């Protein structure tokens, strides 16, 4: 059976933009990994990586607390059987917009990894 990775990514954006941590984390496997250059800045000891839902929750809660108006504007998605490449614009009032690429790795209908890329 083919999983609908675009639908998973669409749910991801909806949950993220709603700052709904429970809905966002429901898309992830318990032991999922996430990489972001912003993690290196805000939590240097992580070297950019967090692993597991508890760590993901802590990272995103921190981001939503610091940036209560943070929103992502979807520019495009490319999907295959195991991943989605998402391009979006990160909007935060008072900051320059940031164009971002992110890859979601998906297995058995759940996100097992995600990696963020930006300059």
Task: Provide a role label for each language-model segment.
Residues 1-119:
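C-terminal and inter-domain tail/linker signature
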């Amino acid at each position: 059976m083919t999983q609908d990775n675009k639908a998973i990514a669409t749910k991801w954006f909806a949950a993220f933009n709603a700052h709904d941590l429970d809905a966002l984390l429901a898309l992830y496997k318990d032991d999922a990994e996430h990489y972001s250059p912003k993690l290196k800045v805000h939590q240097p000891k992580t070297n950019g990586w967090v692993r597991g839902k508890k760590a993901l929750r802590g990272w995103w809660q921190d981001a939503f607390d610091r940036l209560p108006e943070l929103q992502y504007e979807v520019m495009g998605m490319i999907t295959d059987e195991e991943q989605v490449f998402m391009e979006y614009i990160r909007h935060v009032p008072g900051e320059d917009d940031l164009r971002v690429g992110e890859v979601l790795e998906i297995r058995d209908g759940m996100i097992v990894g995600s990696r963020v890329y930006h300059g």
